[in-house]
Amino acid sequence: MIKDILSQRAKEVEELRKLGVNPYPYKFEKTHTTKTIQEKFQALQPGEVLQDEEISTAGRVMTVRLHGKSCFFTIKDFYGRIQAYIRQNEISEEKYNLFKKYIAPGDIIGITGFPFKSRTGELTVYVKNFQLLSKSRRPLPEKWHGLKDKEVAYRQRYVDMIANDSTLERFRIRYEAIRFIRDFLNRLDFVEVETPVLNFIPGGGAAKPFITRLEALDCEMYLRIAPELHLKRYIVGGFEKVYEIGKNFRNEGISYKHSPEFTSIEIYQAYADYNDMMELTESLISELVLHLYGSYKLTYQGVELDFKPPWKRIKMREFIKSRLDVDILEDNDEKLYYVLKERGVEPDTKSREKMIEKLWDLVEEEVIQPTFLMDHPVDISPLAKRHRDDPRLTERFEPIIFGMEMGNAFSELNDPDDQLERFKAQLKLRDAGDEEAHRMDLDFIRALEYGLPPTGGLGIGIDRLIMLLTNSPSIRDVIAFPLVSQTEEDDLEGSAVE
C-alpha cells in the first residue's frame, strides 16, 4: 500500500535526523557527470583500476543490488547512468550500514571515488565516500521498469522523466533543437526580440483567443494567438531581421497535433520575399536534422523522411484540382460545398474561406515528404501579399511534412489600403458567425502607413517539429507539461501534502 510506504519513508527521514544526518543538505561539489566519466574512462580494460583518479558525481539511485558486505548500485543524472560499487571495508561498517538501511531507489546521492572496469567490462565508480542529498519520500513506479500509463505520464512528467530514460532524451533533443535554431539564426544576424503576450486585439492568426481581464485598466485582454503583427512593427521601426521563440494560445480543440498552448518561432526579414523564406526554411530544418542525426534522413512512425534540399514545391490550386476535381478559384461556392458533402464533410459555415480550408484538409495527408504548399487564394490569406502573377492568389507557403502543416510563411502584405480592405472582409466573416476571423487592428494599419519594406515572414510550430525529430506520435509527448484534465489527487494520502 502506498500509504504504508509513505509512512515508512517519513519515519526514515526522522531517524536520519536523529542520527545527525541531514536528509536535504545544501550543496555537493560535483566534478564529473555520468557522460564525462564514460567519455574519459571508457577505454579502461576489464579489471583495470585508476585509484589516483578521484571523481565526484551525483544523481538519483535507480537500482540497488546488495551482496552482504558490498553493494552495486546505479545512479542516473541528466546525461545517463553509471554503475557504482561500495564496500563495508572501504567506508566503515557504520557508514555501510547507514547505506544499506536508508539508501533506496529514488534517493539522490553524491559519491566520491575512483573509476574501474568490472570483470564483465562495465565502467564503475568505486565509492570511497557518499552523501545523501535528497531522501525520496515516494517509491519509483513499477519497480523502476518505467511509467507506462500515458495519462499519468502527462500529469506527472517529473516521474516519467525519472522512470523513462527515453522521455528525458526526448526533451534533451527538444532543447538542443531550440538551441540550434537560435544559433543558426544568430549567425545570419537575426535579432531575438520580444512581443507582448497580453494583447488588446488578438491578431496575427485565425483562431479563437483566450480572454482575460486586466483589473488595473478595467478592460478585457487576450492571450496572444501569434506575435506576427508586433514583429512586423519591429520591421517598420527599423529592425531588418528579427525572430521570437515563445508561447501562443488558441482556445480550440486538443488533438494529437493541436495544443491550446504551444510554442512557435516567427522570423521576419526585410527586403526579402516568400522565395527567400522557403530557402531559409529548408536550410534551417535540414541542417537541424543533420546536426542531430548526422544525416538528412530520419524515420517517423515507420516512414523514412528525406530533408535534403531542395524540397518539393506544389501549388494549392493545382494539387486540390488533381485530387478532388474542383477548382478553388473558378468553381462557385455550390460546387465546393457539393464536393465536400460528397465526401462526408460538413463545413462549419458555407463561407468560401472555410470550404477551401476543408478541401485542403481532405488531401493534406497525401503529402508525406518535406514539401512546400504554395500560392494560397487571397480568401484564406488575409495577411499575405497578392501574388505578383495572379492577384487572386497570395505569395504564401506552408511546409507540409507527414501530412502535417509545420508552419506558415508569406511575402508580407505591406500595402495599408489592401490590408484595410482585408480586415474589413474579415469583419464581415465575424459578423456572419466566424469566431476565428481576424479582427480590425487600426494601429497596425497606421504602422503600415509609415512604411513596411518588402518583407518575408515565416512561422514554424516548434512542438510539431519536435514530434518529427523524436518520432513522437502526439504533441503531448513533446510538451513537458501538457494540458490534461484535472483529477482528484487521492494518491497524496499519507504524504506531507495531506
Swiss-Prot record:
Give the matching PROSITE patterns.
AA_TRNA_LIGASE_II
Q: Where are the transmembrane segments?
A: none
Q: Which GO terms describe its molecular function?
A: ATP binding; lysine-tRNA ligase activity; magnesium ion binding; tRNA binding
CC cofactor: Mg(2+)
Q: Which UniProt keywords apply?
A: Aminoacyl-tRNA synthetase, ATP-binding, Cytoplasm, Ligase, Magnesium, Metal-binding, Nucleotide-binding, Protein biosynthesis
Q: Where in the cell is it found?
A: Cytoplasm
Q: Which InterPro entries match?
A: Aa-tRNA-synt_II (IPR004364), aa-tRNA-synth_II (IPR006195), aa-tRNA-synth_II/BPL/LPL (IPR045864), Lys-tRNA-ligase_II (IPR002313), Lys-tRNA-ligase_II_bac/euk (IPR034762), Lys-tRNA-ligase_II_N (IPR044136), Lys-tRNA-synth_II_C (IPR018149), NA-bd_OB-fold (IPR012340)
Which amino acid positions bind Mg(2+) 2, per UniProt? E405
Query: What CDD domains does the database record attribute to this sequence?
Result: LysRS_core (cd00775), LysRS_N (cd04322)
**What's noted on cofactor binding?**
Binds 3 Mg(2+) ions per subunit.
> What are the coiled-coil residue ranges?
none
Residues the record lists as binding Mg(2+) 1? E398, E405
Question: Cross-referenced Pfam families, in alphabetical order?
Answer: tRNA-synt_2 (PF00152), tRNA_anti-codon (PF01336)
This entry's Enzyme Commission designation comes to 6.1.1.6
State any GO CC term: cytosol
Q: Which GO terms describe its biological process?
A: lysyl-tRNA aminoacylation
Q: Does the keyword ATP-binding apply?
A: yes
Quickly give the catalysed reaction.
Answer: tRNA(Lys) + L-lysine + ATP = L-lysyl-tRNA(Lys) + AMP + diphosphate
Please give the chief subcellular localization of this protein. Answer: cytoplasm
Name the protein family: Belongs to the class-II aminoacyl-tRNA synthetase family.
Q: Which NCBIfam families match?
A: lysS_bact (TIGR00499), PRK00484.1 (NF001756)
Q: How does it assemble?
A: Homodimer.
The protein depicted here goes by the name Lysine--tRNA ligase
Q: Which organism is it from?
A: Pseudothermotoga lettingae (strain ATCC BAA-301 / DSM 14385 / NBRC 107922 / TMO) (Thermotoga lettingae)
